[in-house]
Each structure stands twice: as structure tokens, then as C-alpha cells.
Regions:
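Active-site neighborhood of thiol-dependent amide/isopeptide-bond enzymes
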Residues: 181-182, 251-258
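Flexible, low-complexity junctional segments that flank or bridge functional domains
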Residues: 3, 20-229, 246, 261, ...
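Short, well-structured beta-strand/strand-turn elements
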Residues: 254-256, 269-282
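Bacterial N-terminal signal peptides that target proteins for export
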Residues: 1-7
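Low-complexity, Gly/Ser/Thr/Pro-rich intrinsically disordered linker/tail segments
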Residues: 318-345
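Bacterial N-terminal signal peptides
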Residues: 7-16
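A conserved mid-domain beta-alpha-beta active-site/ligand-binding segment of alpha/beta enzyme cores
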Residues: 234-246, 253
Length: 345
């Protein structure tokens, strides 16, 4: 699958519990040929995807990288060390956002395993919380989403819009959106959920090889180009009472990847202010590629731009820097600053 999503930074996203797996040595005196062939195959698959799709592929000497990665594999101690060799490749590229997802994590992320209990869903989605701070100011958190399962994504989008609808009154015209603990994952349910506060329109772009693909929201649907990636279960999305809203987005060092895309969707808009600390700086987009052992290569394939088409390179800087604090006098200075900014409007 090559549908873009933002991990995580993950994402970043990402052992399993159960019986131990036997270790197969790669050392020549005890070498298991099928094991080594499997590892070499996985490395070759990953390198082919990287050479074809990596967003800075033209800057890489792929023959040299492949040769050195295979040398790394010869030093391996077990069959799973193909993953270590792939990770080594990313380190040589200076790549912080790409990674390899083992089969068990990939199955859970893609929804291949049944969510048998609420605790299972809680492992995939962060907290969604809302409250009134004053008669005119509402506050909500947008969760990280470590799943690509369509049902999970729909439930997240529904839940966020339900929180917004529950907070919305004719007197609420000012909102605080807290992304400080949003560690990323899948941006689409976040965007579909927060859509009532964005309104319909284009709010960013994926940029690669001179091409710009719009990121937009329209009546309950989050779209990549012309394709609906996530939407709420109802025929239409929620619409707030107030057409014109003042909004503060709280950001911090734990605002990562997909969380950063949500922050970028709001940055630079009228009557909107980002307050807090700079984000993590994983402002690139990833695509996923399945490998033969059912692991998944999560590969950075493009950059991100804001609604005006300006490329975001690295950390998103807040409009108003407020360092994290936790004092008895003021346990949340960033939120206090957000309230003050909104009350000045």
C-alpha cells in the first residue's frame, strides 16, 4: 500500500508476548542457508522500494549503499537481522522518519488482528478529551492514531466530531486544540475528526518531484487529492454554530509526524495562533510497502507544505513560544497563554 500516512513519530508507532523464537546464526560455521537467503531477500526488497520511492533518492549512491548493507548482513547474528540492516541504511541516509515495522506490529497497525477488547483499541488510539474552560472557550485533545484499519479510523473521526458537537453551543466561538501529546501515526482520522474546526477547504500539500497533492477536508471527509481516505460514518460531518472561530493550537516536542500535519493545517490561518514549543520536526510523509515476510517498510516519500504551498522543513515553530511548566502557581502555562490570547480577540 502506498497511501500516505504520518507516523508516527510515528510514529513514531511502534514485542509481542509469547513463546521465544529460535535464533538462527549467520556465522559461516553454523549458517542456515534458507535463513540467510530470507534475510538477503528482505534487504533486497527494501532497497528496491527505497531506490524507487525515497523522496531524496537522487542524492543516494544506491549501489554503494546496497553493497555496504549486505556486508552488514554478513555480520548478523540471527535471521531477523535483515531489519537491523535496513535500519542501518536509514541511518546512513540521515533518515529519522523511515523505519521497518515487524510482522506482528504491521498486522496490528493494518487491522489484521481482531480488536477483542476496549484495551486493544486503547493501545492504538490516544486520549480524546474535551471540556469547557469558560462560557465561550472550549478545549479538546486530538489523539495519536497508530492504526490504518478503516473501522478504527472511522471510529476515531466519529469520536472527535462527537466531542466537538458536545462542546459546541451558540456561545462557543473560541477553541483550544491540544496536540502536545500527539505522537503521530495516521493523520487522516485526525483531520476528518477536527474538520468542523477547519472548515471545508485545502489545508496543506504533499510535495514530491515537483508535484503537489492537496490535503483537504470536505463535509466529514479527509482527502488526499481526489481520494477520500477517511470519513465519518454519517452522511455529513458536523458543522459548528459559529462560522468564524478563534483557535489556538498547542504544540510541543511530543507533537510528532501526523500530529505535526494537523498543526500545519492550522498554521498561518486568520484568527489562529500556535502556542507552546517547537514540534518534533518529522514534517515529511511516509508510505508503507509490504515485504515478503509480512513486515512493512515505512518509507519517507515526500515533503509537506502548508495551505499556501510553503514547504515545512523540520520543526514547526509556534507563533508564541511558551515553555512547558508544571508549577503549583500555574500547572499549564501554555494553556493559560492560550486562554489569554483568545480572550484578547
Amino acid at each position: 500500500m502506498t497511501k500516505l500516512f504520518l507516523p508516527m513519530s510515528v510514529l513514531v508507532l511502534f514485542l509481542s508476548h509469547g513463546m521465544a523464537t529460535p535464533i538462527h546464526s549467520f556465522h559461516p560455521d553454523t549458517l542456515s542457508l534458507p535463513c540467510r537467503q530470507k534475510a538477503e531477500q528482505l534487504l533486497d526488497e527494501a532497497l528496491r522500494f527505497m531506490e524507487k520511492n525515497y523522496y531524496h533518492r537522487e542524492l543516494v549512491d544506491w549501489k554503494d549503499l546496497a553493497a555496504k548493507a549486505r556486508q552488514q548482513l554478513l555480520k548478523a547474528d540471527n535471521c531477523d537481522d535483515a531489519y537491523a540492516s535496513i535500519t542501518w541504511c536509514f541511518k546512513q541516509l540521515g533518515e529519522r522518519h523511515s523505519f521497518i515495522m515487524p510482522p506482528d506490529k504491521a498486522a496490528r497497525y493494518n487491522g489484521d488482528e481482531a480488536l477483542e477488547s476496549p484495551s486493544g483499541l486503547a493501545d492504538l488510539v490516544g486520549e480524546i478529551r474535551g471540556e469547557w474552560l469558560t462560557d465561550s472557550i472550549a478545549y479538546l485533545t486530538i489523539p495519536w492514531v497508530h492504526s490504518d484499519d478503516s473501522l478504527v479510523c472511522e471510529r476515531v473521526a466519529d469520536s472527535v466530531q462527537a466531542v466537538i458537537a458536545g462542546l459546541d453551543t451558540r456561545h462557543i466561538s473560541r477553541w483550544i486544540i491540544d496536540l502536545r501529546n500527539n505522537s503521530g501515526g495516521n493523520c487522516w482520522p485526525m483531520l476528518a475528526g477536527i474538520g468542523p474546526l477547519l472548515g471545508d477547504g485545502v489545508y496543506g500539500y504533499f510535495v514530491a518531484s515537483g508535484e503537489r497533492i492537496p490535503i483537504s477536508y470536505n463535509d466529514g471527509s479527509a482527502c488526499q487529492g481526489r481520494h477520500v481516505i477517511c470519513r465519518v460514518s454519517e452522511d455529513h460531518g458536523y458543522h459548528t454554530y459559529a462560522a468564524h472561530k478563534s483557535i489556538v493550537v498547542l504544540t510541543g516536542r511530543r507533537t510528532v509526524s501526523a500530529g505535526e500535519i494537523v498543526a500545519l493545517a492550522f498554521k498561518g490561518r486568520e484568527q489562529t495562533c500556535l502556542i507552546g514549543e517547537p514540534t518534533a520536526g518529522l514534517t515529511t510523509a511516509n508510505a508503507t510497502y509490504s515485504l515478503s515476510d509480512r513486515s512493512v517498510l515505512v518509507l519517507t516519500v515526500c515533503q509537506e507544505a502548508d495551505f499556501a504551498g510553503r514547504i515545512c522543513d523540520g520543526r514547526i515553530q509556534p507563533d508564541q513560544f511558551v515553555p512547558t511548566s508544571n508549577t503549583a502557581a500555574d500547572p499549564d502555562t501554555a494553556r493559560s497563554a492560550a486562554i489569554a490570547w483568545l480572550q484578547s480577540k
